[in-house]
UniProtKB/Swiss-Prot annotation:
GO terms for molecular function: arginine-tRNA ligase activity; ATP binding. HAMAP family: Arg_tRNA_synth. This is Arginine--tRNA ligase. GO terms for biological process: arginyl-tRNA aminoacylation. The gene is argS. Keywords: Aminoacyl-tRNA synthetase, ATP-binding, Cytoplasm, Ligase, Nucleotide-binding, Protein biosynthesis. GO terms for cellular component: cytoplasm. It catalyses: tRNA(Arg) + L-arginine + ATP = L-arginyl-tRNA(Arg) + AMP + diphosphate. It comes from Methanococcus maripaludis (strain DSM 14266 / JCM 13030 / NBRC 101832 / S2 / LL). The keyword Cell division does not apply. It comes from the Archaea. Its EC number is 6.1.1.19. It is found in: Cytoplasm.
């Protein structure tokens, strides 16, 4: 039974009866549960039409309503507050979670295909923490959209045709790869050294341009030769390292789409021709697309006069392919790509396609300062994770919960993944963030360890409990801590729905912390195993069991596992 929707429907009927008009009604939640579970201010909105004081309207409405699942309705200073029957509500909530188990929070299947592109870092060095923000938000959003019923395909767009990759291919001829290092790190070292070489020898720049041109010509002609093999090997070598990092963080892509595919298939040439026929292309030192009809002053560079394509044209071809194979597309991009993303979208619109949705994220840094791949000064995601694991292992040893170094390693890895992923995803993407260790590995207030520890506590309580009797569950006067946690647990499906709808995984992250904190208050104030009243004890065990399920299901939406012991 959806009590909230029942209240809204009843209020809408009441308003129509009073005024003859429809009214959009939204319920608020009072700050404390003793003030009610839901509240509405409709009396203030009705005052003008009914020519009565809000206080009187609220009292009249409160006295006239009877709603299934609502124990009492109070009018307070013009507001109408609704109090649920927690005995019935708790039984229903616990029963639903217990029955659905790992499926609790998942919504009905929709007949809609989504292509979600995230990460898509250039294969010229290891992921830095800016890429980390992209991949964590992207993977969390994927999981939330799947739980919300969408058919989701995640894609990684591989830039194998840009200047950066030509520098890597050129550098591989000049410098030896360090095979003792992780592949993407070895490639990164070559990239940095090659950039230094180019800075000192400007005449070598022409060789980079020749590599780019010759690779594109080979791709366009459908030729496989020594050069295409060099590009393919360099990219795949980097991707091997990337996939290791992604796997460590529980991130998986369904498809790696290479930029060159669209040149080989002839689609890039087709896109250029279609755009030429729009009458919106102007020629100066290059071909540019005039998007002023869409309020964009800057022109989009489409191709060089010699006909060779640019990243933008290949990106448009990629987006057309996406749009032809899904109901909607979502891209994760850094805020510095805003103008480019708008230009690509308006080009799609010009050609008659839907625009892609874009989730932009702001810069992320460590307190030590910023990052730069080109100069080689940056913090890689691998280093960030290893540091998190080292700090987590130290904490696990201090707490004495593991029996062996192997177990310490296993627990520390899960804590580290949680610390990195959760600390990134809890912050709204549009806000710049500083990754702080005292927050990421906080066991007391805001870090993922708070949530994982609440789960470990649930596991410990249930360790020796064989079964929980359903007889007379919640047939007593529940206290505020019990009511609060049960109400929180019931919200997961709506949280998933909302987070998917607005594409904001931080909603899920904030919710799961609320659940953990709500459970900790319940644990501190409500004896479970030591409770003498069997009805109360079984009811509280049911709360512990369903809290464990909700914590597992919710952290799974964020790609985070439970250590079990902490």
């Amino acid at each position: 039974m959806d009590v909230e929707n029942l209240i809204i429907t009843t209020l809408k009927d009441k308003v129509k009866g009073l005024t003859g008009n429809e009214m959009d009604i939204r319920l608020d939640e009072p700050p404390a549960i003793n003030m009610g579970d839901y509240s509405t201010n409709i009396s203030f909105r009705l005052a003008k039409d009914l020519k009565k004081a809000p206080k009187m309207i609220a009292e009249d409405i409160a006295n006239s309503l009877s709603i299934l699942g609502i124990e009492r309705i109070e009018a307070v200073n013009g507001y109408i507050n609704f109090f649920m029957n927690y005995s019935d509500f708790s039984k229903e909530t616990v029963s639903k979670i217990s029955d659905e188990k790992e499926n609790f929070g998942k919504l009905e299947k929709r007949n809609e295909k989504v292509i979600l592109e995230h990460t898509s870092a250039n294969p010229n060095g290891p992921f830095h923490i800016g890429h980390g923000r992209n991949m964590v938000i992207g993977d969390s959003l994927k999981r939330i959209l799947i739980a919300s019923g969408y058919d989701v395909e995640t894609q990684y767009y591989v830039n194998d045709m840009g200047r950066q990759e030509a520098i890597v291919v050129f550098g591989n001829e000049k410098f030896e790869l360090d095979n003792s290092k992780k592949a993407d790190h070895a490639i990164g070292e070559v990239y940095v050294e090659t950039n230094k070489l180019l800075a000192e020898n400007e005449e070598l720049e022409q060789e980079i341009l020749n590599l780019m041109k010759n690779y594109e010509s080979a791709c366009e002609a459908g030729i496989e030769n020594e050069l295409t093999e060099k590009f393919k090997n360099a990219v795949n070598y980097s991707l091997g390292g990337f996939k290791e990092t992604l796997l460590t963080l529980n991130i998986y892509h369904d498809k790696f789409v290479w930029e060159s595919e669209f040149v080989k298939s002839g689609m890039v040439r087709e896109v250029i021709n279609r755009l030429m026929n729009t009458g919106k292309v102007v020629e100066d030192e290059v071909y540019r697309l005039d998007l002023s009809d869409y309020g964009i002053e800057k022109k989009l560079v489409l191709a060089r006069l010699n006909g060779t394509s640019l990243y933008s044209t290949r990106d448009i071809a990629y987006h057309i392919t996406k749009m032809e194979n899904c109901d909607f597309a979502v891209n994760l991009l850094g805020a510095d790509h805003k103008l480019t993303a708008v230009m690509v979208n308006k080009t799609l619109a010009l050609l008659g396609y839907n625009e892609a949705e874009v989730v932009f994220y702001e810069f992320i840094s460590l307190p030590e300062g910023s990052m730069s791949t080109r100069k080689g000064r940056f913090i890689s995601m691998d280093e960030l994770f290893e540091e998190a694991k080292s700090r987590a292992a130290e904490e696990v040893r201090k707490r004495g919960v593991a029996q062996s170094e192997e177990e310490i390693e296993e627990i520390a890895k899960k804590i580290a993944v949680g610390a990195v992923r959760y600390n990134i995803v809890r912050i709204a993407p549009e806000k710049p963030m500083v990754f702080r260790w005292d927050e990421a590995l906080d066991f007391e207030k805001v870090g993922c360890p708070v949530i994982q520890y609440a789960h470990a506590r649930c596991s410990r309580i249930l360790e020796n409990v064989e079964n929980i009797s359903n007889e007379n569950l919640f047939a007593y006067d529940m206290n505020e801590n019990e009511k609060t946690i049960v109400k929180l647990l019931s919200k997961l499906p709506k949280i998933v729905e909302k987070a998917a709808e607005v594409r904001k995984p931080q909603i899920v992250a904030n919710y799961v912390l609320d659940v953990a904190q709500g459970f900790n208050k319940f644990y501190a104030n409500c004896p479970v195993l030591k409770e003498e009243n069997e009805t109360v004890k079984n009811s509280r065990l049911a709360i512990v069991s369903t809290t464990k399920t909700v914590l597992e299901n919710t952290l799974d939406l964020l790609g985070i596992e439970m250590p079990g012991k902490m």
